[in-house]
Structures are given as structure tokens and as C-alpha cells.
UniProtKB/Swiss-Prot annotation:
Biased composition, class Polar residues, residue ranges: 742-759
Ligand binding (Zn(2+) 1): 41, 44, 64, 67
Chain sites annotated for binding Zn(2+) 4: 525, 546, 553, 556
The keyword Zinc-finger is assigned to this record: yes
Primary gene name: msl-2
Name of the featured protein: E3 ubiquitin-protein ligase msl-2
Organism: Drosophila melanogaster (Fruit fly)
Length: 773
């Protein structure tokens, strides 16, 4: 249906507006409205975007991809696609997408044709049918044409774009597309083709009746498909705006004998040409009789282009010459300025140059830069001598200057040079003083190094003596070491006071002072790399310095470290200074266990405090974060089987878990390399529940009184009371007696008058017994 409506509208749109009757214009108006309905979404009533159609339906009620689940505005409602509302019932319709591109091209053609003016003020009149359709928005036909020409064409997004810069500004078109033509601009074909224009087409081109003979493309002008593969024709339109309203067609003839074909795109590889109407007063070298409408001219033979190119070259060369001349003049000026400044034999030129420098600010900046480059980073004595000679020449020749202004300027320059020399001399003196201070500081640093070497030798001897002694002797040697360091401390302070005047030397001395404060390195653990046959036992013999000093192994290379000492007496170098002032009075002796020798070694902070009171109760303090534990860690298992961290205290003093009896110790794994989790933790042994007390010999308690349970009386059934046990009744032995009324004779029921009485009495007996149930 949409293709049929498109073909009907296209046949009318390809005709000339001057030959169309009013009825044809109305048909075009109604056809555009019908085509707009068929190409619209039945949900949003706009032109389709990514059209989808119902599967297996022929109603052709298309929707946009984003409107699949929306409410359809069809009047009347469609019974075929009423239940279609998801991607399972809709499928993509690419034919409708191509139809939309054709509709866009049609609207672009109508927008630039004379038919657009004929449709001014008209609204599309759609015939009322019983077919379900949408209602068009309240717009005019011209507004619908503008809407169709502005359809966003997304099909050429992923196509290759032209790489050359001049192709980006070219109007995009397809090889088969023919743009609107006019008397001023006519399209041309490539050079190897010739355009055959009939008389009707020439008349239409001259009277501005464009396009009724040209084929209409199937893709819009915005598409760039095939741009690089095919050398398409260049389209040049007079204006991109829509054509206005015209009361009647333009029938005036235009003289096209003076047209000149000039290349539009000189950078392109193809020799395209466009015909322009030149004014009669224009002087051209072309013969007007030789050129016709649409004639192709090869631009390689054109002389005007050569003239233009030559003019451009001359202009470029002239600008280059001017630039070169200015640069040469500037270089000459700078060179003359440098020569004047460096030569001391021409003082008159120096004074003239100084006068010019004060007038021209740009030249003054250049001179300052050249002077700074000439001086360099260091100022030798030869430069100072040259400045002195220049000062002498200035003093001699200032009287010879012809004008008073030059004399004053020379005097000012002389004063400036003197001040510069004074600054240079002061800087040299400062440098000499800094060098002297640096030499003094260097000598002091060497003396400090020698003393430090002596200190290293003394500490090594003390460590050898301390190898077989207990922990207390080790601490005494540290006090001696600290006293030796205290004696040497005043030396770098004196060095600092000497070198406060210098700048760079002071920084070097400060760095050396820090190096002097560094204490000698502790002996490294060589466990695992000592070359012994059994590397698993090297951590527990006398060859391990860490084991001998009752410390944990530092940098151990063993397969499995067997050193039982997992805590150091002194954790950092700062604790050595604290030991000199705070010595513990009582040091607890280490406790040994049968399973594994574990030494309880309290930290320096615990040693500095008084021993805990033995009478104080022992308490466990829970920890929220195990990494914040500053004391030995104790793990206690709760009722859920989970372990929780605690610190053990006696009063306010921390305790070592070994002293309490916690002998089970586990190694903790560090999942985070930046944490401070303790290496080992002690597990609190599980406390067995107390045994039940033994039974006492006291008499057993009296038994509990029995509770009387009141139960409802059992259902009593009436016992079978024989008739013999009752008065005036005899037992009925057989059924015959019951039927015969109690007679023992074999007689039928009703033979005697007392049969009914007996039956009544029996019934009353049965009913009276039901009261006892």
C-alpha cells in the first residue's frame, strides 16, 4: 500500500508545475496525506524510526522499535494486530526503512520545486474509509513536506567517510541523482561523458521548470553510499532554501551565449566544470559562440587558471620576501647591537646605542637577552676586567659626546655597570665563604666517621662477650653503647653551628648527620643458607644468632622455622634508650614446658611497670580488632565453636598467657601485608564441667503425694438381664417365643391377645434401660 501511494505521488511530482491542473494538485495533496499515514507509527503517530511490522499480518500497521508495547491509536481498532505487543509478535521491516528514505528524497524534491508554492495553505484531505488508520497531526501539507525532508538518516553512519579534506565540504550526492537545475547553475557529467539535452529540457532549464525530466533517486541526498568507489557528479544548487510561492511560472528567456565553464574544485582528481552566466560587460578570452549549455570544458587548457595560479605564486613569494627582509633586518640589528656591546674600542657608538635602547622597548628587551646569554651562568675574572675597561673608555669619551642627553645616558650606564660589578664581587665573596665552611664541615664529618668506626669495633667485641650470657648482660652492654653514643653526640651539634652561613653545604652536612645517627646493623639470621646437612635444625643451635639472643628469626630462609622464641625483648631502636633510664627491679624467670620450650618474655613497656599484684583477680578483655592488640593474644572458644580474641590482665597490668598456664600456642597467618597482627596467639584450654557430687547417706526425701486423677465415668452398658430374673417375666428362649408373645408353643404372631402387650412391655424395658447409658 505504501509503495502504491508513493508511485502515485511521484508521478505527479515529476511533472512541471505549469502544466498541472488544479485537480492534479489536489491529488498530490491527498496522496501526500495518505503516504504520511502509511509511513507513520500507529503508537506515536510520527514518522517511523526503525520500523517493525506484525508477524504474519497484512494490515501493515507498523510501529517504531521503541513503541512496541505502546497503545495503538487506530480508528477503528485493528483485529489482526490487536494482540501484538512484544518482540515475539513483531519483526523488523527493512523494506519500510528503504521506503522512508524514498519518501525523504521525494520531500526534498518537492521542497525545492515550484509545486511547493502551489501547495501553500492546503491541508491533506484523506478519504474516510473503514480501514483502521491513524489521525494525522493538525499540520499543513508544506509542514509535512518539511518534516519528511528532515528525516534523520542513520543508515550512512557506519559507511567510510572521505579522507581528503576537500571532499568533506562537497555536497553529498549519489551517482544517479540529478539535482535541481536552473538557468544560473547546470550540472555537468564527468569528462568522458557528454550530456545530451533535448529542446524540451533546455527550455525547461531556461524557464526554471526543473527536474520533471530527471530520474528521481531511491536514496536521500544525505546518504554517502558509494562516495569513494564512484566518481559522482558535483551538485551545486543556487540556494538550499525552499522555493517560494509563485503566482505564475517564469517564462522569460535568458541568453546563455555568454556562459563560461570554470572549475569549481581545483583540488579534485576529476575535471568537473560548472556553467555560469557571465555579465555582458565582462571581458573573457572565451568565444561566446563556442560555448553551449552543459558543455564540458577541460580545465587543463584554461589560461585564466594559469594566470590566477601565477598571481597567487607571486603574492606568496612577495610575502615571503617581506618576511625574509624583516627577519634579516632584525638579525642585522641584533648582530650590530651585540658587536656594539662587546667591543670596547668604540664608545661613541655605545652611547648612541644606549640612547636608541631607551627609546625602543623591543630593542631593549633583545639587548637584555643577548647580554644575559653573553654573561652565562658563571662570571669569570676576565669579564670583570672587560667591564672595567669599558668603564674607563666611557669616562674618557663622555666629554666628546656632542649632546647633553648622550652624556647623561652614558653616565647612567656607567653607574649601572658599577653596581653590577659590586654585586658580582659580593657573590664571589659569598661563594668563597661557603667553600670555607664546607671544608670545615667536611673535616668534622670525617672525624665523626672515625669515631663511629671505633664505636663499631667496641660494639662488636661486646656482642661477642655477650653471646653466652643471659639477657641482663645484653642489656648492660646496650647501656654502655648508649653512653658511648651520648659522649659523641656534641660533635655534630658543633658542626651545625659552624656551617649555618652556607646554603648548599648546610644541606649536605644535615644529610651526613642523619647517617651518623644510624646505629650499626644487627647480625642477620643465616638459617637455611648456612650449608648444613639438616637445615631444619639450624634455627635451634648455637649457630643461629637470633636463637642465642632469645629473639625471633629475622629474614629466616628455613623450610620451617624451629626457633621457639617468637617475640623480641626490644622491638625497635627507640626502646634501647628507654632501657637506660628504666631498669626493672624484678625480672620473671622463663617457664619451660615439657612439650616445647616456651620462654615468657614481657615487652619493654611491661618491664618498665611495677610487677602486678598477685592478689588481684585475672580478667580477660575482649578485642574487636585483632590487629589493635598491643599485648599477647589469647583465643577463647565460645559456645558456637568460634574463637574470639582477648587480652589477659591481672588488675590493670597485662600478663603473659604462659604464666597463667596457657601452653597451647598457634601461629597466625597474615592475610593483609600492611596489618600488624601478632605472629602467635595462645589458646585458652577448655574447662571441663564439674563432676556431680557423690550421693549423701542422708535418708531419702518422702515420696511425693499421689495425685488423684478424676476421670469421667466409663460408659456403662446395661447388662443382659434375663426375663427370668424379673418378676412377672419369663425368659424368651427362642425367636418364636418373642414373636408369639412369650408362648412356648409354636404359634404365629397375633394368635393371642396378649402378644401386643408383651411387645409393648419389651419396648418399654428397652427404653427404660437407655436412661442408664
Amino acid at each position: 500500500m505504501a509503495q502504491t501511494a508513493y508511485l502515485k505521488v511521484t508521478r505527479i511530482a515529476m511533472r512541471s508545475a505549469s502544466n498541472l491542473s488544479k485537480r492534479r494538485v489536489e491529488e498530490l495533496n491527498s496522496g501526500l496525506g495518505e503516504l504520511r499515514q502509511l509511513l507513520s507509527c500507529v503508537v506515536c503517530c510520527q514518522l517511523l524510526v526503525d520500523p517493525y511490522s506484525p508477524k504474519g499480518k497484512r494490515c501493515q500497521h507498523n510501529v517504531c522499535r521503541l513503541c512496541l508495547r505502546g497503545k495503538k491509536h487506530l480508528f477503528p481498532s485493528c483485529t489482526q494486530c490487536e494482540g501484538c505487543s512484544d518482540f515475539k509478535t513483531y519483526e523488523e521491516n527493512r523494506m519500510m526503512a528503504a521506503q522512508l528514505l524514498c519518501y525523504k528524497t521525494l520531500c526534498v524534491h518537492l521542497l525545492h520545486s515550484a509545486l511547493f508554492g502551489e501547495l501553500a495553505g492546503m491541508r491533506p484531505q484523506v478519504a474516510r474509509e473503514l480501514v483502521p488508520r491513524i489521525k494525522l497531526p493538525p499540520k499543513t501539507t508544506q509542514e509535512f513536506i518539511r518534516e519528511g525532508s528532515n528525516i534523520s538518516d542513520t543508515f550512512d553512519i557506519f559507511l567510510p567517510q572521505p579522507d581528503l579534506p576537500f571532499l568533506k565540504d562537497m555536497p553529498t550526492s549519489l551517482p544517479a541523482e540529478t539535482p535541481p537545475t536552473s538557468a544560473v547553475t547546470t550540472p555537468e557529467l564527468p569528462y568522458d561523458h557528454h550530456l545530451n539535452i533535448s529542446d524540451i529540457e533546455a527550455e525547461a532549464a531556461a524557464t526554471a521548470e526543473q527536474g520533471h525530466f530527471s530520474p528521481l533517486p531511491l536514496l536521500p541526498t544525505g546518504s554517502r553510499m558509494g562516495m569513494l568507489s564512484h566518481a559522482g557528479q558535483i551538485v551545486i544548487a543556487t540556494e538550499s532554501s525552499e522555493s517560494g510561492f509563485m503566482d505564475q511560472a517564469w517564462t522569460d528567456q535568458v541568453d546563455l551565449s555568454g556562459t563560461v565553464s570554470v572549475s569549481k574544485y581545483t583540488n579534485s582528481g576529476n575535471n568537473f566544470a560548472v556553467s555560469y552566466v557571465m555579465p555582458t560587460s565582462a571581458t573573457t578570452k572565451f568565444d561566446p559562440q563556442e560555448l553551449q549549455i552543459g558543455q564540458v570544458v577541460q580545465m587543463a587548457d584554461s589560461t585564466q587558471l594559469a594566470v590566477l595560479a601565477a598571481v597567487e605564486e607571486t603574492v606568496e613569494t612577495s610575502t615571503q620576501l617581506t618576511v625574509l627582509s624583516t627577519t634579516v633586518e632584525e638579525t642585522v640589528e641584533t648582530s650590530t647591537q651585540l658587536e656594539v656591546l662587546t667591543s670596547a674600542e668604540e664608545p661613541n657608538e655605545i652611547s648612541d646605542q644606549l640612547a636608541n635602547l631607551q627609546v625602543e622597548e623591543s630593542d631593549e628587551a633583545l639587548v637584555e637577552e643577548t647580554v644575559e646569554e653573553a654573561e652565562g651562568t658563571s662570571i669569570p675574572s676576565e669579564v670583570v676586567a672587560e667591564h672595567m675597561e669599558e668603564d674607563q673608555h666611557l669616562d674618557v669619551h663622555t666629554s666628546q659626546s656632542p649632546t647633553q642627553t648622550e652624556m647623561e645616558e652614558a653616565v647612567e650606564e656607567h653607574v649601572a655597570t658599577k653596581t653590577q660589578l659590586g654585586h658580582v664581587q659580593t657573590e664571589l665573596q659569598d661563594a668563597e665563604s661557603l667553600q670555607k665552611d664546607f671544608e670545615d664541615a667536611k673535616a668534622a664529618a670525617e672525624e665523626a666517621k672515625e669515631k663511629e668506626k671505633d664505636l663499631h669495633a667496641i660494639s662488636a667485641e661486646l656482642q661477642k662477650e655477650d653471646s653466652d650470657e643471659p639477657t641482663l648482660k645484653r642489656k648492660r652492654t646496650r647501656t654502655l653503647k648508649a653512653s658511648q653514643a651520648a659522649k659523641i653526640e656534641p660533635v655534630p651539634s658543633e658542626v651545625k653551628t659552624k656551617v649555618q652561613s652556607g646554603k648548599g653545604a648546610l644541606r649536605r652536612i644535615r644529610g651526613k648527620d642523619k647517617e651518623e645517627k644510624v646505629k650499626p646493623p644487627k647480625p642477620k639470621c643465616r638459617c637455611g643458607i648456612s650449608g648444613s646437612s639438616n637445615t631444619l635444625t639450624t634455627c635451634r643451635n648455637s649457630r643461629c644468632p637470633c636463637y642465642k639472643s632469645y629473639n625471633s628469626c629475622a629474614g629466616c630462609h628455613c623450610v620451617c622455622c624451629k626457633n621457639p622464641h617468637k617475640e623480641d625483648y626490644v622491638e625497635s631502636d627507640e626502646d634501647d634508650d628507654l632501657e637506660d633510664f628504666e631498669m626493672p627491679k624484678d625480672v620473671p624467670e622463663p617457664m619451660t614446658q615439657s612439650e616445647e620450650p616456651v620462654v615468657a618474655e614481657p615487652r619493654q613497656e611491661e618491664n618498665s611497670m611495677a610487677p602486678p599484684d598477685s592478689s588481684a583477680p585475672i580478667s580477660l578483655v575482649p578485642l574487636n580488632n585483632l590487629q589493635q592488640s598491643q599485648h599477647p593474644l589469647v583465643l577463647v572458644q565460645n559456645e558456637k565453636g568460634e574463637y574470639q580474641g582477648f587480652n589477659i590482665f591481672q588488675g590493670s597490668k597485662p600478663l603473659d598467657p604462659v604464666t597463667v598456664g596457657f601452653t597451647i600456642r598457634v601461629q597466625l597467618q597474615h592475610t593483609d601485608g600492611f596489618g600488624s597482627l601478632p605472629q602467635y596467639a595462645y589458646i585458652m584450654p577448655t574447662i571441663d564441667p564439674p563432676n556431680p557430687p557423690a550421693p549423701s547417706l542422708s535418708p531419702p526425701p518422702p515420696p511425693a503425694p499421689d495425685r488423684e486423677v478424676i476421670e469421667p465415668p466409663a460408659k456403662k452398658f446395661r447388662t443382659s438381664r434375663t426375663r427370668r430374673g424379673r418378676a412377672n417375666f419369663s425368659a424368651l428362649d427362642t425367636v418364636d417365643e418373642l414373636v408369639s408373645g412369650g408362648s412356648r408353643s409354636n404359634s404365629a404372631a397375633g394368635d393371642r391377645s396378649s402378644a401386643t402387650d408383651n411387645a409393648h412391655s419389651l419396648f418399654e424395658e428397652i427404653m427404660s434401660g437407655s436412661d442408664d447409658l
